[in-house]
Amino acid sequence: MLEIIYKDTDIVIIRKPYGLDCQYQIPQFLKQQLNCDIYTVHRLDTIVTGVMVFCLNQKSAAILSKEITEKVFKKEYLAIIEGCFKEQQNRLTDLLFHDKRANKTYVVKKKRKGVKEALLEYRQLCSINNNSLLLIRLLTGRTHQIRVQLASRSHPIIGDGKYGSNDNGKIQLFCYHISFVHPANQMVMDFKLLPNQSLLFDTFKNHLKEGELCEKY
């Protein structure tokens, strides 16, 4: 059973578990669990966990998809990286190319067919034992964007072997916060989750208090 955080007649909010893809597996499980159609409007990588919204009808899905395109839909992540940035906060801008065959994204220098601009903002909350906890605001939604933008600056996410981490454990990337306008009643919907027990995230638990995180931006 998937953990449901909130549900109404138009949307359902869940805690996405590790190892399930959000395009096929999670919609199928939710359909069985809720006995209704499920529509995916945004994605998290299979190996990434965190808060997600799914729609329960086509109209709501179309409205939320438009919010994502128009950047009304907001997403923030927590990540633990190798090393630390010199700048405590910054905006990262890159050109990315996604190789579909290899399922890998690369930072490139020049604009060409298939290349897209990627932007994110981060704030470095603290550093312990040469690892750092980041709060990340995603400004564009490119494939593997956070992972490759951090790795390209020699700060791969812990556990992300695909992009250079030496750690073989689970990736330490968590979708912490989503915010959007409800597709039916136009109310602002705001959902925050903290990671479940994780040895690395527990190391930073004093900095993972929701009130403190809310003040970081």
Regions found by a protein language model. Give the residues of each.
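Residue-level recognition of short loop/turn positions
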Residues: 101-102, 140, 184-185
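Pseudouridine synthase
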Residues: 30, 98, 128-180
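A short beta-strand motif that forms part of the nucleic acid-binding face
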Residues: 18, 57-58, 68-69, 138-140, ...
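Long, intrinsically disordered, low-complexity Ser/Thr/Pro-rich regulatory/activation regions
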Residues: 177-195
